[in-house]
Amino acid sequence: GSGDHRLYQEVALGFGGYKALKLLGIKPAVIQLNETATIFAALARLDELCSNGMNLYEAIVYVRKHTLYTNHTLLQAAEPEFHRSQFEKLVLPNIKSNAVRCWLMEQFRNDRLRPNLLAIELTEAKNGVSKLHARVANFPDRNNDKVKFQAITNGIDLETWVLPETLQTYRDHGIIDKFGLPTNDFSEKLDSLSSADLRYLKKLGRKELNRVLLSRQDQYGKSIQIPENAILFDFKRRFANYKRPYMPFENPDSLRQILISHNAHYILTGKVHQGDVTMYQKLLEVLKLIDNDPVLKERVHYIQDYDEELGRALAIGSDASINIPIVGLEACGTSWEKDIANLKLLISTSDGGVAD
């Protein structure tokens, strides 16, 4: 949203984060702004330079040369916009330089400002998080020219998200190098893994998933266990309309037949944005559909309180991941990367990082 608390959080993160680095004796050569919410770190550096005697023009050039803006959003209009009075109350008290104060106030249009405009103005290097995202992201600058983003596809930390035994298998077979990156012939080496080894790793993953599920509750307030011999599909990501968590339930007859014929279960989990009333309603409709169908009621499980632990357990212990965003609306996504790193099948539209 665009309320005072959101701006307060961004101010605390940016100005407070930059001050914390100074107190730790850290003088960063380059600051990476991961999304617009961190922009006030660059503004804090600009204020510091001007307060120490550098003129505004030279300070802006310096900050631009030493700041990288990583954008994860496709449309500028989707980001928060704040009123001048909010900046006067929450931002200006953190700025000492009159030159920086005046420059900041000049960025407003009709008394409103999106902080991403500051990110565009105060950074020279800008990147999107997939090739497709960098190509289609629509962010105009002050002159209404489209900003050019370089493409750097998001990745994941294998140590965090991959079953340890699977990761060790990758190392033992030369599938990844000492930096955790795929080797040139990783595909051929993956193909050479035996079926027995793969089944063993999947068995370990299912055991870990069921351990986590013991402490979780489904839509009926009960814990569940997925049989070792059952195929498990999952949808585990933020519940946003463009991600279409409801799509598999638009044809319940087909879904029912798939689950029966393949001895399969389906886990649905994720969080709805607090203000997304439409998505809440769609989720409620899906849960009612499941409740009214004996097969779906037995085999489709909505797990409450989605978090990192559950996300990791499903990446490790499920068999196939459902990733079906509307093409052109996903910047990158990383859940699918965690899935394929754990040797799962990926059922996906070709969007974001998947398209790469």
Spans of features found by a protein language model:
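Catalytic cores of carbohydrate-active enzymes across secretory and cytosolic contexts
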Residues: 1-356
